[in-house]
Amino acid sequence: MAASGSGMAQKTWELANNMQEAQSIDEIYKYDKKQQQEILAAKPWTKDHHYFKYCKISALALLKMVMHARSGGNLEVMGLMLGKVDGETMIIMDSFALPVEGTETRVNAQAAAYEYMAAYIENAKQVGRLENAIGWYHSHPGYGCWLSGIDVSTQMLNQQFQEPFVAVVIDPTRTISAGKVNLGAFRTYPKGYKPPDEGPSEYQTIPLNKIEDFGVHCKQYYALEVSYFKSSLDRKLLELLWNKYWVNTLSSSSLLTNADYTTGQVFDLSEKLEQSEAQLGRGSFMLGLETHDRKSEDKLAKATRDSCKTTIEAIHGLMSQVIKDKLFNQINIS
């Protein structure tokens, strides 16, 4: 019973995150030093600022990052990722946490973190992990996957001195609420570069107190298409992890775990609706301001989408509880 429950929980997680199995362990873990040196020497990303388009993350690296992000609660956490480059794809093989000071709005790396980083990478090479640092990750608890002004500055600095480098952002709170990993991978454009107009990206809810920071910097970076993979080795390690944690999947409830987050979402939504109502009210007394009206209606439409998203997540959490109650609590005695 325990084995079947563990396997079902693991399969559900893999399907929700579109986990793909690598064709061969050797294919994905083989490190060609000569090929990597040739790529570093050619530096194709300097000729095309949109060169890297894809980001592949191993299942084990993904789990380590999500578990680290979740352990931070409402505080931001930070870590480093090891990997390699294959054409236009950045492959993240492993990740590790950094001993940094975190707040609810930023993470601050001190000298000890940089010493730890250098020692970890050096020790990894001694045990046969030849991949170099390929990026950094940090968490945005409850406010989505995007780069703030500080994040953009940090990533620009990294790309200037440590190319190739990618920034990954994880929202552990929304991951629990939606049941799917909420993660984004980003690269910044050089200063002064104006990117071509792109189509609308996937909509995500941004809290009112973060909208300004999001809007000011959203044109300074672009998102990579993220996918996940697992090898036979990953599968064995995942089975060991799931044997330990699968019970938590059944015993926990997103309605209880994320009660504060849901309350915050409703409060944020009420502020957005009040702001939209005030703008629409002012617009009714001002003639000839069609642009103003359109902006107000656009804000109202976004607030409506946020409301639908919060409602759907709450319904999913409630349905999950009802199903578990039917399965485990209502035993028919014949």
Swiss-Prot record:
Q: List residues binding Zn(2+).
A: 138, 140, 151
Coiled coil ranges (UniProt) are: none
Q: Which residues carry this modification: N-acetylalanine?
A: 2
Query: Which Enzyme Commission number(s) are listed?
Result: 3.4.-.-
Query: Any idea which UniProt keywords this protein has?
Result: Acetylation, Cytoplasm, Cytoplasmic vesicle, Hydrolase, Metal-binding, Metalloprotease, Nucleus, Protease, Signalosome, Synapse, Zinc
- Pfam families (alphabetical): CSN5_C, JAB
What is its biological role? Probable protease subunit of the COP9 signalosome complex (CSN), a complex involved in various cellular and developmental processes. The CSN complex is an essential regulator of the ubiquitin (Ubl) conjugation pathway by mediating the deneddylation of the cullin subunits of the SCF-type E3 ligase complexes, leading to decrease the Ubl ligase activity of SCF-type complexes such as SCF, CSA or DDB2. The complex is also involved in phosphorylation of p53/TP53, c-jun/JUN, IkappaBalpha/NFKBIA, ITPK1 and IRF8, possibly via its association with CK2 and PKD kinases.
Q: What is this protein called?
A: COP9 signalosome complex subunit 5
Give the species this sequence originates from. Homo sapiens
| Gene name tied to this protein | COPS5
